[in-house]
Amino acid sequence: MPLFIAFAFLFIIPSTAVLISNNSDFGTTNFVYSQPDHMNSNVTNSLNIQNIPVKKVHVGDIDIAYKTFGKGDPILLVSGSSSDMNAWEPSTLRNLSSNHTVIIFDNRGVGNTTAGTKSFSIQQLANDTAGLLDALKIQKADVLGYSLGSFVAQQITVTHPEKVNRLILLGASCGGKEGVPESPQLVKFFSEMVNKSINNIPITPQEVKMLLSIPMGSAWMELHPNFLEAIPEAKDLFAGIPSNTIKQQNDISQNWMATNWSGICDELTKISNPTLIITGTHDNNVPTANS
């Protein structure tokens, strides 16, 4: 998805979600249809993700910006296309941090991470991410990837299997040209919204609603008309993205898409890690069939 602001609400699954597991570590049921529950409000409510200092570490030809917080086994979160680490939904991060050491970071060329000199590719992003784990002296972590981050997470698991404990894929595809393509109308709409953002043209309330209905699904939006007010921190993030950041991230996003990742569909049998796949039945941006 080439528009950063459409990702201000990551990890909110549309009204009905399909959870697919390949290993009993995640439960014995292969297909689970679930309604989203309210977050546990008692878990680490005092943790303010925005106040956690950003650190930097040199990996290869780039300086990667990252944050770590929480206690427990490490879990590494890989963001979607054109999203920086601030796009993750805050209450989800707080809940994860109750029993995990959470690592969030900016991908190459996004947010506070430098672009470096190497060409952009899914394999390069996977190498960057594996290098981050090495730099942080983390031998193995659970890896969660969202959207484009799911490509990176799969690639890491294939090329650096020793670094991945459990794999969680959200809004995922194994890439290539055999999947269900994104609607041309959606691509056109995203492009129009990006151009508005870059040129400081206000996005109308109706356009905001449409932006959110794409990953959420219109049925979910109708059932939760006031959901934005329920996550004020995400609302603040949504309202505070500078236009130059949006332009930078859109340029990077277009560069990623131009790499035309061939995917790992033919290599999925190499993944023996416990894997959980989460997909929304009403997600218009990442068709359920691709997951």
What is each model feature region?
Residues 59-114:
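Conserved HGGG/HGGXW glycine-rich cap/lid loop of the alpha/beta-hydrolase fold
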Residues 284-290:
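Conserved alpha/beta-hydrolase "acid-adjacent" motif
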Residues 81, 281-283:
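Acidic beta-to-alpha connecting loop that harbors the catalytic carboxylate
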Residues 167-202:
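Flexible "cap/lid" loop of the alpha/beta hydrolase fold
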Residues 205-251, 257-262, 267:
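Conserved alpha/beta-hydrolase catalytic His-Asp/Glu region
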Residues 271, 277-279:
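Short beta-strand/loop motif that positions the catalytic acidic residue
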Residues 104, 109-144:
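Active-site loop/oxyanion-hole signature of alpha/beta-hydrolase fold enzymes
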Residues 139-181:
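Conserved hydrolase catalytic core segment
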